[in-house]
């Protein structure tokens, strides 16, 4: 799928070096089709890394996509320059009158805080409310998933005895569900979190589509098929967990070595990426079956989910 992003976005050169089709703005303007409008609400400190990971996965389909990047306005990121944020990112006030075919809400490194103590919680809740009427389908990732389950359904998060960090085996619970089409009987997903949700707490119109014995529910979807909650990080690069581990070591946090990740459990050994194909499948299936096939041609007709 050609993704239409600003010509000078750093992710563009990275993706082009990987032979991923990135369409420049001028060429996109001359395409006689309606592209999918996708909003990425990026809450991660490493903006460029997260943008690149998600854009890489959105590129695996034949439909053109226009991307908007959204940042918080009530909290200013300390890890990304203001010039960068102002150049490439929009605030909620700038996009709140717009409709989107799909939206992705990332994780955030704030999971040990009570939700209401997060500096941008009020703004985050306003955007969650807005997403119900202005995004046809929304995918929530890690903290974004836990926080949305809490806000929309009142489902609490539960602290873990120690951080879940590593690559874990998962099983699909509904093999023929369109979101999991093409998934193997066992697939692998990275996790990196201190909190979880209990399957017994999931209620209402929520359905668990995939789970892990070690990490619990991993892919959850609403019965209306417009909200997806992924508790892990299929978007992660090969070295993301290694970089997190080394970062925490340098901070003196005594992190556990990510499970099932480094060969022979040796942090100096190069890890293998075991989740690449299923990451592509999940994002491609979501885009095809729950965005492209379902969203109205006239975006103004998108209503409450």
From Swiss-Prot:
Residues at the active site: 142, 233, 235
Pathway terms, separated by semicolons: Amino-acid biosynthesis; L-methionine biosynthesis via de novo pathway; O-acetyl-L-homoserine from L-homoserine: step 1/1
Superkingdom assignment: Archaea
Chain positions of site Important for acyl-CoA specificity: 111
Recorded catalytic activity of this chain's protein: L-homoserine + acetyl-CoA = O-acetyl-L-homoserine + CoA
EC number: 2.3.1.31
Alphabetized InterPro entries for the sequence: Class_I_gatase-like, HST_MetA, MetA_family
Keyword Repeat included in the entry's annotation: no
Family statement: Belongs to the MetA family.
NCBIfam families cross-referenced by the UniProt entry: metA (TIGR01001)
PANTHER family linked: HOMOSERINE O-SUCCINYLTRANSFERASE
Record HAMAP family: MetA_acyltransf
Function noted in UniProt: Transfers an acetyl group from acetyl-CoA to L-homoserine, forming acetyl-L-homoserine.
Name assigned to this protein: Homoserine O-acetyltransferase
Native organism: Methanomassiliicoccus intestinalis (strain Issoire-Mx1)
């Amino acid at each position: 799928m050609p993704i239409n992003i600003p010509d000078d976005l750093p992710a563009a050169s990275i993706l082009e070096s990987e032979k991923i089709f990135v369409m420049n703005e001028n060429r996109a303007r001359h395409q006689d089709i309606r592209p999918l409008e996708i909003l990425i609400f990026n809450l991660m400190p490493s903006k460029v890394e997260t943008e690149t990971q998600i854009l890489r996965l959105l590129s695996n389909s034949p439909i053109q996509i226009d991307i908007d990047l959204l940042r918080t306005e009530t909290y200013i990121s300390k890890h990304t320059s203001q010039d960068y944020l102002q150049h490439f990112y929009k605030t909620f006030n700038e996009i709140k009158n717009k409709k989107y075919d799909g939206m992705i809400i990332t994780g955030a490194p704030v999971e040990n805080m009570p939700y209401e103590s997060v500096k941008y919680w009020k703004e985050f809740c306003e955007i969650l409310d807005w997403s119900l009427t202005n995004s046809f389908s929304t995918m929530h990732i890690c903290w974004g998933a836990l926080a949305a389950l809490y806000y929309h359904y009142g489902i609490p998060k539960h602290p873990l005895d120690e951080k879940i960090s590593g690559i874990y085996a998962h099983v699909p619970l509904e093999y023929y569900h369109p979101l999991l089409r093409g998934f193997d009987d066992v697939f692998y997903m990275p996790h990196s979190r201190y909190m979880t949700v209990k399957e017994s707490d999931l209620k209402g119109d929520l359905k668990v589509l995939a789970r892990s014995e070690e990490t619990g529910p991993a892919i959850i979807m609403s019965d209306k098929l417009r909200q997806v909650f992924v508790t892990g990080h299929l978007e992660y690069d090969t070295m993301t967990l290694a970089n997190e581990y080394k970062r925490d070591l340098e901070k003196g946090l005594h992190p556990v070595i990510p499970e099932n990740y480094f060969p022979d459990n040796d942090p100096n050994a190069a890890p293998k990426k075991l989740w690449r194909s299923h990451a592509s499948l999940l994002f491609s299936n979501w885009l095809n079956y729950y965005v492209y096939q379902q969203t109205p041609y006239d975006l103004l007709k998108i209503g409450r989910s």
